[in-house]
Regions:
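Short, mixed-charge low-complexity intrinsically disordered segments
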Residues: 38-111
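A short, exposed loop/beta-hairpin motif centered on an aromatic-Gly-Thr core
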Residues: 12-24
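Residue-level detector of functional hotspots within protein domains
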Residues: 3-5, 19, 44-50
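A short, charged, amphipathic alpha-helix used as a generic interaction element across diverse proteins
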Residues: 21-37
Length: 111
């Protein structure tokens, strides 16, 4: 039975997949985000009261959830990416030198 769920959200479209192991789910997360991220660069968006700069916009979000593991990666409108753990209370994962957001998430989730 598939224990880990991968959810990718992009401009109102949600795609879900299930995987048997955490390493499989994280590899699929990296593949999906690498495939979709190049087309997600954005310019400033006009809000009700202010302009929202690309670095403040989450253009693409990928999340992994399963037994003892919950986290994901936000791809910002400027192309940068941040890893986080948790769901309701997201905690950013600090990157070590030379580490990608995907590597940081793997380290944080113990995969």
């Amino acid at each position: 039975m598939a224990a880990y769920k991968l959810t990718v959200r992009r401009r109102g479209v949600t795609r879900r997949e299930r995987f048997a192991s955490l390493p499989e789910a994280l590899a699929a997360l990296e593949a999906r985000l690498d495939e979709l991220a190049p087309g997600e660069r954005r310019g400033p968006e006009r809000g009700l009261v202010r302009d929202i700069e690309p670095v403040a916009q989450v253009a693409l979000r990928g999340e992994v959830a399963g037994p003892g593991a919950r986290g994901g990666i936000d791809v910002r409108g400027d192309g940068s990416a941040e890893a986080y753990t948790g769901r309701l209370r997201r905690v950013l994962v600090a990157r070590e030198p030379g580490e990608t957001a995907h590597d940081a998430l793997r380290r944080a989730l113990g995969a």
